[in-house]
Structures are given as C-alpha cells and as structure tokens.
C-alpha cells in the first residue's frame, strides 16, 4: 500500500502543467500579432488597466471595458459600439504564461463552438 502511494505521488509530481501566472498580465502594455488573409503581419498594441483596455490598430483607437471574473479570465465590452455585432461581449481566457507573454483563447460570450487562440507579448508594465 505504501509503495502505491509513493508511485502515485511520483506520477502526480511528474505531470507538467502549464504555468499560469495570470495576475501579472492583467495590466500593462501589450502587442498582439496576427496574419491577414493576404499574408501580411498585422500588429495591434494595447494598454490594459484593471477595468479598461485601449487598443491601437491601423491608426485607429478602440476601447473596451474589462471585467475580470477570475485571475485568468475576463469579459470585454466595447465602450462605444457602432453595430449590433460590436455590442456582443467577448470572453478571454489566459491558457498559459511565461516570462513576458501568454497564450489565450477568446470568443463571443456563450459561443463555445467558435473559440480562437492567440499569443500576446507584454511590452511594459
């Protein structure tokens, strides 16, 4: 019985769980890169406080309220939506972190079939 317990502890301790130090990524200035349909690299920079995110893309500014529902998950709502689709809230969940970046998934709230993933690099605090 004692041997089984030791083996169980060894098995559990050898599992490699992804690092999730989400609190350090709730605020700061970040950079998000994506690829357009034409193959161009698109760069979005954004600054996030505990309750507001301001993004800069193609010389346009976009603002969202941020509500953290856990250390690693938040809900975004556009400050001044101009269309029905912009009124939809977006759910974002940090999946893993490392020293200065994180991997995340996002979708409209309640839309579990259309989740997408991304990678963000933290530029400054």
Predicted regions located by residue number:
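Sec-dependent signal peptide recognition
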Residues: 1-8
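C-terminal motif of bacterial Sec signal peptides marking the signal peptidase cleavage site
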Residues: 11-14
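Short, exposed beta-strand-loop hairpins at the edges of beta-sheets
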Residues: 55, 103-117
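Bacterial signal peptide processing site
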Residues: 16-18
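An anionic, turn-rich surface loop/hairpin at beta-sheet edges
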Residues: 75-99
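N-terminal glycine/threonine-rich, aromatic-flanked beta-hairpin/loop signature
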Residues: 40-69
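Tryptophan-anchored aromatic micro-motifs
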Residues: 22-38
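A short, structured loop/turn motif at beta-sheet edges
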Residues: 65-73, 94-101, 122-125
């Amino acid at each position: 019985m004692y041997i089984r317990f030791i083996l169980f502890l060894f098995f559990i301790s050898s599992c490699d769980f992804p690092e999730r130090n989400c609190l350090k990524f709730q605020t700061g200035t970040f950079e998000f890169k994506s690829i357009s349909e034409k193959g161009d690299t698109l760069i979005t920079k954004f600054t996030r406080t505990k309750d507001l995110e301001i993004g800069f893309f193609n010389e346009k500014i976009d603002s969202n309220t941020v509500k953290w529902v856990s250390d690693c998950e938040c809900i975004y709502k556009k400050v001044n939506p101009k269309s029905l689709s912009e009124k939809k809230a977006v759910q974002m969940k940090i999946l893993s972190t490392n020293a200065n970046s994180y991997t995340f998934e996002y979708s409209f709230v309640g839309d579990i079939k259309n989740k997408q993933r991304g990678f963000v690099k933290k530029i400054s605090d």
